[in-house]
Amino acid sequence: AYRQTENLLYGRSFHAEAHIVHHHSDFADVAEASKHLGGIAVVSIFLTNDKQRYNPTTNRALDTILNHLKDLIEFTEEEHVCRAENRRIKRTGIYSKLGVERACRENNPNYDADSPDGDPSNKCQLHKKARGCGDPIENVTFNPNDLLSSIPTYLTFEGGLTTPPCSESVIWIVAEHPAYISNKNIEYMNKLKSRIVNQTISDFGNLRPLHDPAERDVFRIIYGRYPPRREEDDERGDGRHDLRDDDDNYDDDDYYNDDYSNDDYYDDDYYYDDYDDDTDDDHKDDGRRDRGGGDDKGGRGKGDDRGGRDNGDNRTGRGNRNDRGRRGNGDDSGGRGNGNNRDGRGNGDSRDRNNGNGNGRENGGVRGNGNDRDGRRDNGNGGDNGTRRGNGDDRGGRRNEDRGENRRGKDDQERESEDGRRRRRRFNGRRRRRGRGDDKGDDKGDDN
C-alpha cells in the first residue's frame, strides 16, 4: 500500500513524489523567498513502480539521483557523521521548546532560537544547510530538462510548503504523468532516517487529510513542446523523444496509450480534442494568409508565385536581394529605399503616393498605379473588394504577377505600358476588371 504522497492525483497516491524547488530571482535563497507570495515554484513528479496501471516512463535524470541513495551512510547514535552537529543543537535547549519551536526542532536541526518572536517563520530555517555534517555526494550530473515529465501535461495551483512553517508562498506545478521508480530505490527511501532523533521516516508517512481548496482554481496545462533537446539526448531513446513527431511536437495520439488511459484512473472528460485543424484550404478566400506548398498559393511558401515570403529573386518581404518588397536599397524596392521604382516612400521616379502613373485608391484598401505598382501590388493590378490583395488567377496575399514578366521588382522596360492590352480573367467564379494606368483605382476591378 502507498503511504500517501504530498499531493494526490484524482484521489490516488503514489510510492513517492519528487519535488524540483525553484525560488524567485528577487530573493537570495528559498528561505527568504518562502516569506513572499509566489516566491517559490515547485515542479512535482509522482514516482511509481505500478507499470500495469500507470505505464510510468523512465526518467533517467531522477534515476541518476535515486541511484545514489545506496551511497548514504547508515549511522548509529554514537558513530554517525552528524553527531557533533546534533550535540551542538541539543546544547541550545531546542528540545525544551513548545509550539512552533517544537514542530521545527522535530523536523529540522537548523532551528533559529534567536529569531524575533513576532515572525514564527523565521524560527524555522528549514532550508539552510547544516554545517560540518557529512560530505555531499558530488559529480552527479544530468540535464535539468530531463527531470520533467515525459508527457508535458501539468496541474497548477497556488499552495504552500509541505514542511513547517508551511508558508502559503508556493506555485505548484504537478506533472500528471508519473515516472518510474525501481523497487530497490523504494526500499532505500523507506529506510531513510531522521538524523536528529534517529527515527525511520517512512514509519510516519504522509497520512494527513488534504487541505481544502479554499476556492482556489486548479488549472490543467498542456504544453505543446519542450525546449529543443541536445543531439546526444535524442540518441538515448529515453521515452520523451519517442513521443515526438517529425516537426518536434507531441501528437495528441501519443499522449496516452491504452494501458495508461485506464477507466478507473482517467475519465473521458480529461481527454482533450485533436486541435491540429487543417484550416489552410478553408481560409484561402476569406482574407487570411495560408501556408502553402504549391505555385499559386496565397501564403508563405517556397514556390514561384506565392503571396507570402518568397525565396525567389523578387521577394515581397525582407530579403537579401535587390528586388525587395519592403525596405531596401535596390533598384526596385517595394518599401522605403533609394531605388528608382518604389511603391512606398522614396525618391524614385514612380511613386504611388504622389500622382505617379495613373495612381489611385482602390477598394481593396491599397494605393496603386498603372504601370508600376499599386501599393503592395503588381503591374496593372486593381484592388479587390476584400481585405486581401491579389491579382488574376493567383490567390490573395501579397502576390507577384504571372511568374516573371510582370512581377514586382522587374525593370521598367520589362513591364507593360499604360496603354497595354486589356484582358479579362475569371477569378473565384466571377469576372473582375483589373485597373489600367489611366483608370481610377477605386473601381471594383481593374484593367491592364
Swiss-Prot record:
Residues 422-435 have a biased composition (Basic residues). Glycans are attached at residues 139, 198, 314, 385. Residues 281-334, 342-354, 370-379, 386-421, 436-448 have a biased composition (Basic and acidic residues). Residues 229-448 are annotated as: Disordered. The keyword Glycoprotein applies. Disulfide bonds: none annotated. Residues 1-222 form the Alpha-carbonic anhydrase domain. Gene3D superfamilies: Alpha carbonic anhydrase. Its EC number is 4.2.1.1. The keyword Metal-binding applies. Residues 357-368 have a biased composition (Gly residues). Keywords: Glycoprotein, Lyase, Metal-binding, Secreted, Zinc. GO terms for molecular function: carbonate dehydratase activity; zinc ion binding. It is found in: Secreted. Residues 245-280 have a biased composition (Acidic residues). It catalyses: hydrogencarbonate + H(+) = CO2 + H2O. Its main location: secreted. One of its GO terms (cellular component) is extracellular region. Component of the acid-insoluble and acid-soluble organic matrix of calcified layers of the shell (at protein level). Pfam families: Carb_anhydrase (PF00194). Reversible hydration of carbon dioxide. Belongs to the alpha-carbonic anhydrase family. This is Putative carbonic anhydrase 2. It comes from Lottia gigantea.
